[in-house]
Amino acid sequence: ELAHDTATLLEAHRLGIMDAVALKLSKFGGLSATRRARDLCLNLGAKMCVECTWGSDIVMSAALHLAAATDPARVLNVCDLSGYVTPRLAPDAPTREAGRIAPPTGPGLGITVDVDRLGPPDMILE
């Protein structure tokens, strides 16, 4: 639960206290950084939970794809909390059925985001 970057992963491994780790996209700073953390955990022999901290449909789709691209023997679980977040941002987002969930199969993250639900941007960089 306390891991949030490469340094914390390496320190936990050095101390011998990292049998498993929660990789949260929001804590690591997005999908690319979490993928690098996942790769490090694979190299260090740790098992993983792949998730986000109360993420939306968008972030949950990313987490599902990351988990699906990881050796199943190393994934303990994927915690889906997106169903509790409102409003839902993608009508075709994956949902749990009988305790299971799978990544969407469309292009990109596999979902169609309802951009009207996002609201105006806080910042535009040009």
Q: What spans do the regions from the language model cover?
A:
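Shared catalytic-loop signature of beta/alpha-barrel
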Residues: 3-100, 104
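C-terminal extensions of enzymes
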Residues: 88-126
